[in-house]
């Protein structure tokens, strides 16, 4: 299995990069990708930059170049949920594009034109505790 890990900022990915064995580095589309192993798992790590456009560019380059089986986005995030605190881990069950609104065209708020979905389910197929 090959896992891609993306963080928006260097501090979010530094410890992971230090943990990689037999690592190599390559730059694609101004993004530095570090490939290595943690045990028997191949890992490709990168700092995308802040924002969904940078994250999308990084994710696409990672998928096309390294054929990762899954991509995990790690790092700092905000929340409106009172139950979550600092250093808590949150896993989404679905994602939504919160800043897109084509309701003036008759669409529901949040609708992603083309795939005609508001909520996109997340797969937990590869997730397991070690």
Task: Spell out what each predicted region is.
Residues 125-130:
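Conserved small/polar residues in nucleotide/adenosyl-binding loops
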């Amino acid at each position: 299995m090959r896992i891609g890990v993306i963080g928006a900022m260097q501090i979010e990915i530094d410890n992971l990069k230090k943990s990689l064995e037999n690592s190599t580095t390559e730059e694609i589309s101004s993004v530095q990708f570090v490939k290595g192993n943690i045990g028997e798992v191949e890992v490709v790590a990168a700092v995308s930059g802040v924002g969904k456009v940078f994250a999308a560019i990084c994710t696409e380059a990672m998928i096309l170049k390294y054929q990762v089986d899954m991509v995990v986005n790690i790092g700092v995030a905000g929340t409106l949920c009172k139950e979550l605190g600092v250093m808590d881990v949150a896993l989404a069950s679905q994602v939504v594009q919160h800043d897109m609104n084509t309701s003036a065209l008759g669409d529901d708020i949040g609708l992603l034109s083309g795939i005609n979905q508001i909520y996109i389910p997340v797969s937990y197929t590869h997730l397991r505790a070690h």
